[in-house]
């Protein structure tokens, strides 16, 4: 088994009527949780990292871990650049072996978004690397980028078709009412807008900001055309809260091999639930 691109993975999901979850990881332990759970459930998953994660862990280190785990568990894996914005940064990581990229230029005007994305697509496709881009903006925070929810822009269905055709992307991230981070109250998703986008665009569609969404909402988005579900904050919250609880209850604990187990277990529960919500168990 080896590190693969997301293109075939998402095309299979689109044909099969399920979604592939993209789990944001940060270190060895969080990667172990995702890969072990996916392998046990025979589920396709995407291992995602923001620029901050790649800076923290190191691109070569992450690639080596993914490759080793794919072989160990006989499970195809994808490592994905999540919310990357700089061409040179993306190019360097692609040359190092990354096979899946999200170029996020959604903060730019429409024409500039197209231009920036097309530059990345033209480069990445030379290396058989799949490219995702976003049209519209989500509220909330990703790494150090903050978007006020009042300023978040929903995806225009007609523009989505023009955007997809002009850039040559392999998948499209849409803004339909989700946000990065956890929700203070239940979000109201614009399913009608999503249906219209699907009518205009035949590419696999991506939903960011899925942490905290109900099973009903996730499964409804999949029925309408979402093929990739991104989860980050919910994983961090489960991991960190379980770790805090353990250390509070066991102040004498000093061995990370012991005190990280409860954190991994809590995160594993979230990963298992998201895989079930996405309907991708047994699809790898």
Swiss-Prot record:
GO terms for cellular component: cytosol. It comes from the Bacteria. GO terms for biological process: D-tagatose 6-phosphate catabolic process; galactitol catabolic process. The keyword Protein biosynthesis does not apply. It catalyses: D-tagatofuranose 1,6-bisphosphate = D-glyceraldehyde 3-phosphate + dihydroxyacetone phosphate. Keywords: Galactitol metabolism, Lyase, Metal-binding, Zinc. Its EC number is 4.1.2.40. The keyword Zinc applies. The active site is at residue 82. Pathway: Carbohydrate metabolism; D-tagatose 6-phosphate degradation; D-glyceraldehyde 3-phosphate and glycerone phosphate from D-tagatose 6-phosphate: step 2/2. Zn(2+) binds at residues 83, 180, 208. One of its GO terms (molecular function) is zinc ion binding. Its cofactor is Zn(2+). InterPro entries: Aldolase_TIM (IPR013785), Class_II_FBP_aldolase (IPR050246), FBA_II (IPR000771), TagBP_ald_KbaY/GatY (IPR011288), TagBP_aldolase_GatY (IPR023955). Binds 1 zinc ion per subunit. Gene3D superfamilies: Aldolase class I (3.20.20.70). Dihydroxyacetone phosphate binds at residues 181, 209-211, 230-233. Forms a complex with GatZ. Catalytic subunit of the tagatose-1,6-bisphosphate aldolase GatYZ, which catalyzes the reversible aldol condensation of dihydroxyacetone phosphate (DHAP or glycerone-phosphate) with glyceraldehyde 3-phosphate (G3P) to produce tagatose 1,6-bisphosphate (TBP). Requires GatZ subunit for full activity and stability. Is involved in the catabolism of galactitol. NCBIfam families: cbbA, PRK09195.1, PRK12737.1, tag_bisphos_ald. PANTHER family: D-TAGATOSE-1,6-BISPHOSPHATE ALDOLASE, D-TAGATOSE-1,6-BISPHOSPHATE ALDOLASE SUBUNIT GATY-RELATED. Belongs to the class II fructose-bisphosphate aldolase family. TagBP aldolase GatY subfamily. This is D-tagatose-1,6-bisphosphate aldolase subunit GatY. The gene is gatY.
């Amino acid at each position: 088994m080896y590190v693969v691109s997301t293109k075939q993975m998402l095309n299979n999901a689109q044909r099969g009527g399920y979604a592939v979850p993209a789990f944001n990881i940060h270190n060895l332990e969080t990667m172990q949780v995702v890969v072990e759970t996916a392998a046990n459930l025979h589920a396709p998953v995407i291992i995602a990292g923001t620029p901050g994660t790649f800076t923290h862990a190191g691109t070569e280190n992450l690639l080596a871990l993914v490759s080793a785990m794919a072989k160990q568990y006989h499970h195809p894996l994808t490592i994905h650049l999540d919310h990357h914005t700089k061409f040179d940064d993306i190019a360097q990581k692609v040359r190092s072996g990354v096979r899946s990229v999200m170029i996020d230029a959604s903060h730019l005007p429409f024409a500039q978004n197209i231009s920036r994305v097309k530059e990345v697509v033209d480069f990445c496709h030379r290396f058989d690397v799949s490219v995702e881009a976003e049209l519209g903006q989500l509220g909330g925070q990703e790494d150090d980028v903050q978007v006020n929810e009042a300023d978040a822009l929903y995806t225009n269905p007609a523009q989505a078709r023009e955007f997809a055709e002009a850039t040559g992307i392999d998948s499209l991230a849409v803004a339909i009412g989700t946000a990065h981070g956890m929700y203070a109250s239940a979000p109201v998703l614009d399913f009608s807008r999503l249906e219209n986008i699907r009518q205009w665009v035949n590419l696999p569609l991506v939903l960011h900001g899925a942490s905290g969404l109900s099973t009903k909402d996730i499964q409804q988005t999949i029925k309408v055309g979402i093929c990739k579900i991104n989860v980050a904050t919910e994983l961090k919250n489960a991991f960190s809260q379980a770790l805090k609880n353990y250390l509070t209850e066991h102040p004498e604990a000093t061995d990370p091999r012991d005190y990280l187990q409860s954190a991994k277990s809590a995160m594993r529960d979230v990963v298992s639930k998201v895989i079930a919500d996405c309907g991708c168990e047994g699809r790898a």
